[in-house]
Regions:
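Short, small-residue-biased leader/transition segments that mark boundaries at the very start
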Residues: 1, 5-7
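Short beta-strand-centered segments that line the small-molecule binding cleft or hinge
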Residues: 11-25, 33-45, 139
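Hydrophobic residues within well-ordered alpha-helices
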Residues: 14-15, 63, 110-111, 150, ...
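A ligand-binding cleft/hinge motif common to bilobed small-molecule-binding domains
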Residues: 25-33, 81-83, 111-144
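Periplasmic-binding protein-like
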Residues: 42-51, 76-81, 130-183, 186-200
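Flexible hinge/capping segments at coil-to-helix
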Residues: 51-68
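Ligand-binding cleft/hinge of the Venus flytrap
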Residues: 76-99, 129-133
Length: 200
C-alpha cells in the first residue's frame, strides 16, 4: 500500500533514500533536476502577503530594512537571501529574514506583526489569505511563474512514467480541474503533465 508522511523538513534530499517521491509545491529548477526527476502538475509564481490594508506600507520593490518571513528550503528563501545581499551591497538597511520550517509559522508571523511580509509560492499566498479570513492580503501580483512538480528518485523511469500517466489521466477526465476549482487555484492549471519540462 501507499504510506504517506507529512514532514516539516527539506524533502528533496530524502527522495530516493527515504522516500520514493515527494508531493509538494516543488518549483522546478535546473539545480533540483540534478537530484530528482519531476512531473509537472501546476504552474505557480511567487507572491507576497502583508497584513490587511498594508499598514506598514511594504513596497515589494524595496524590502530593505523589513522583517521578511519565508519557509525554509524554498526558492523564496534563496531569493530573499539574494535580495538581502543586494541591500547590504547598496548600503541600505538589512533585511531581517525569519526562516520557518513550516509555512504556517511564516503566515502567523505576519498576522501577529512579528514580520512585515511573507514571501511564498502564489498558491500558498492565496491559501494563507483564505485561511486567515481577511487578516492578510496579497501585495502586488504573482511574478516569476514556473511549473510546480512531483519529485521522484532520479533515474526511476518506471515510477516517473506512472506518475506522469496518472496526472495526465486526472487532467484529461476533469478530476484535476475540479480539485483546483475547489481550492480556488484553477488559474495555475496545466493541460499536460510533463516529465522534466524545460525551465529557464
Amino acid at each position: 500500500g501507499v504510506q504517506t508522511c507529512a514532514l516539516p523538513i527539506s524533502i528533496i534530499p530524502a527522495i530516493g533514500t527515504k522516500y520514493d517521491l515527494g508531493i509538494a509545491a516543488f518549483t522546478i529548477t535546473k539545480e533540483r533536476m540534478q537530484s530528482v526527476d519531476f512531473v509537472s502538475y501546476f504552474t505557480a509564481g511567487m507572491g507576497y502577503a502583508v497584513a490587511k490594508g498594508n499598514p506598514k506600507n511594504v513596497n515589494p520593490d524595496d524590502l530593505c530594512g523589513l522583517n521578511v518571513a519565508v519557509e525554509t528550503g524554498t526558492v523564496e528563501e534563496d531569493a530573499i537571501n539574494e535580495t538581502a545581499k543586494q541591500c547590504k551591497a547598496d548600503g541600505k538597511k538589512d533585511i531581517t529574514i525569519q526562516s520557518s520550517k513550516q509555512q504556517t509559522d511564516a503566515t502567523t508571523a505576519v498576522v501577529t506583526g512579528k514580520a512585515d511580509v511573507f514571501f511564498a509560492d502564489s498558491p500558498v499566498v492565496g491559501y494563507a489569505i483564505a485561511q486567515t479570513e481577511g487578516q492578510l492580503e496579497q501585495l502586488g501580483k504573482d511574478f516569476d511563474s514556473v511549473p510546480n512538480a512531483i519529485a521522484i528518485k532520479k533515474g526511476d523511469s518506471q515510477t516517473t512514467e506512472a506518475v506522469q500517466k496518472a496526472m495526465q489521466k486526472l487532467m484529461d477526465d476533469g478530476t484535476y480541474g475540479k480539485i483546483l476549482q475547489h481550492w480556488g487555484v484553477e488559474s495555475g492549471a496545466l493541460d499536460k503533465a510533463e516529465i522534466n519540462p524545460s525551465v529557464g
